Amino acid sequence: MPRSALSVISFCHRLGKQERKRSFMGNSSNSWSHTPFPKLELGLGSRPTAPREPPACSICLERPREPISLDCGHDFCPRCFSTHRVPGCGPPCCPECRKTCKRRKGLRGLGERMRLLPQRPLPAAALQETCAVRAEPLLLVRINASGGLILRMGAINRCLKHPLARDTPVCLLAVLGGPHSGKTFLLNHLLQGLPGLASGEGSWPRSAGSGQGFRWGANGLSRGIWMWSHPFLLGKEGRKVAVFLVDTGDVMSPELSRETRTRLCALTSMLSSYQILTASQELKDTDLEHLETFVHVAEVMGRHYGMVPIQHLDLLVRDSSHPSKAWQGHVGDVIQKSSGKYPKVQGLLQGRRARCYLLPAPGRRWASRGHGSSGDDDAGRLRAYVADVLSAAPQHAKSRCPGYWSEGRPAARGDRRLLTGQQLAQEVKNLSGWMGRTGPSCASPDEMAAQLHDLRTVEAAKKEFEEYVRQQDAATKRIFSALRVLPDTMRNLLSAQKDTLLARHGATLLCTGREQTLEALEAELQAEAKAFMDSYTVRFCGHLAAVGGAVGAGLMGLAGGVVGAGMAAAALAAEAGMVAAGAAVGATGAAVVGGGVGAGLAATVGCMEKEEDERVQEGDREPLLQEE
């Protein structure tokens, strides 16, 4: 086909795709040049770009899935390339420009090469800019109308499995307090100071409002535990910690039942590593009572999950009547008030894990910033406290400490293992699974401790029985080892081990429903023993059949050889061919009989003689084995 004709055809295809009702005429000068591939830029831009579409065919303008690309820059679909290609041409010839050029791989080969490129970690600033999408408070634990708790694992995974927190140690700043204690107002100021500190600027935002974060007032965030969906990376390079803000909601509300409040304290202790308790004017008896419950529950959870119960606690008191009062004196007053009545709080305040701050009341002075020197001074105090909290947050990442309670003393810093966001999400899931199985008797920290103790006891009994079954399975893998232990004997061994475990671990249970717990444990152990016995019985029968077949075939094969040799010696007068045939048939027949008897021995060991007689009678059909 002439070159001009091909150019006209390609030109018609192009214009016909855009305007099918327009008539035209062209020549070789009207051929379009294909746009070259854009340069591949690896990096993260400020705006997300749409995915690039595959190149269009130069003839039909379709976008094939696997285009044929040539070095000249033109692309074709397989159908057009095979139709308009010049026949008999060795190297590929472009149907568009008639140049002889090599063929390039399509987009599939390009994608494979891009996957083989070395992956470079993105800068923290760029990654944080990308991840800062739709940051909002998320409800993690909801309190329904009946007072029950609903754990939203989807929201927890969205926060803790964030790209910045999935494989990074996490610090959870949780603010506790009763109604109208300035809790939400403090969260907003913490939220304002975090972006500047995370970006390295360290500057306070110029806007002095409460921010667009946690809402303030009666219609704000309540009835559950909330968390800011976006973490902030703080700390030195190489030791970054993902910091989250947590609003505990109504965890200290007197309207909740004791059971709901105890469970909320357990979830709060799991979802916090730096607690701030806010109180108006002074710590009341109700605040100390709720704090005593929280510390007790945190110790119970720490003992069960191997975590440091209270890593750091701030007592933030709004004392508008005595703004210059020393915080040491206030802590002394609190310790004296809690003496004997709140031992957990007293022990916490006497240690190094708690400190006290006195700030002006939020309703009067913080809102008057810019209208006098006193307002500026009070706002400076708030900023100083917020900066102090955020600078100390990376040092209080959520920590796991296995030897904390076993040795009876705080472990060293090097003994702790910092939990990442993904690990903490798994621990929260385990806690929710236990709470879903427990009964209504969890109205106090002591009852929760008893239930967790029984849970550890049951798990220990299960693991011990599983280990015993594994040992028996490993000891009976070989044939002769398995034949020494009959299935009935193995069943008796498992039953005795189960009774021993139930008697030993059942005596250590603490909850009132001890019988129900033992019945459930016995059912699980019996199910595991039955599953093992089913597989062991099949294995034992297989080993017995193999040994019986081998022994029977060997013994009867030897007997058949002896009988054949004797008959050959008795038939010396016969012809040589008849003697050889007799010996061969005798040996073969006896071997067959032996194999049959061996199989019978494996199936029914007690009836070996009867099965042997039947097999021999079947073999008497052979002429040379007939009896006189």
Curated annotation (Swiss-Prot):
This enzyme's EC code(s): 2.3.2.27
Residues engaged in binding GTP: R318, D319
SMART domains: RING (SM00184)
GO terms for biological process, alphabetical: embryonic brain development; endoplasmic reticulum organization; neuron differentiation; protein autoubiquitination; protein homooligomerization; regulation of cell cycle; response to hydroperoxide
Residues that span the membrane, as ranges: 544-564, 577-597
UniProt pathway: Protein modification; protein ubiquitination
GO cellular component: cell body; cytoplasm; endosome; membrane; neuron projection; nuclear body; nucleoplasm; nucleus
Enzyme class: transferase
UniProt domain GB1/RHD3-type G: residue ranges: 167-409
Zinc finger RING-type: from-to: 57-98
Membrane topology (UniProt): Multi-pass membrane protein; Peripheral membrane protein
Alphabetized Pfam families for the sequence: GBP, zf-C3HC4
Record's keyword terms, sorted: Cell projection, Cytoplasm, Cytoplasmic vesicle, Endosome, GTP-binding, Membrane, Metal-binding, Neurogenesis, Nucleotide-binding, Nucleus, Synapse, Transferase, Transmembrane, Transmembrane helix, Ubl conjugation, Ubl conjugation pathway, Zinc, Zinc-finger
Catalytic activity line of the entry: S-ubiquitinyl-[E2 ubiquitin-conjugating enzyme]-L-cysteine + [acceptor protein]-L-lysine = [E2 ubiquitin-conjugating enzyme]-L-cysteine + N(6)-ubiquitinyl-[acceptor protein]-L-lysine
Family the UniProt entry places it in: Belongs to the TRAFAC class dynamin-like GTPase superfamily. GB1/RHD3 GTPase family. GB1 subfamily.
Subunit structure as annotated in this protein's UniProt entry: Self-associates. Interacts with SP1 in an oxidative stress-regulated manner. Interacts with SIGMAR1 in an oxidative stress-regulated manner. Interacts with ZBTB16 (via C2H2-type zinc finger domains 1 and 2).
Name of this chain's protein: RING finger protein 112
Organism expressing this protein natively: Bos taurus (Bovine)
Gene: RNF112
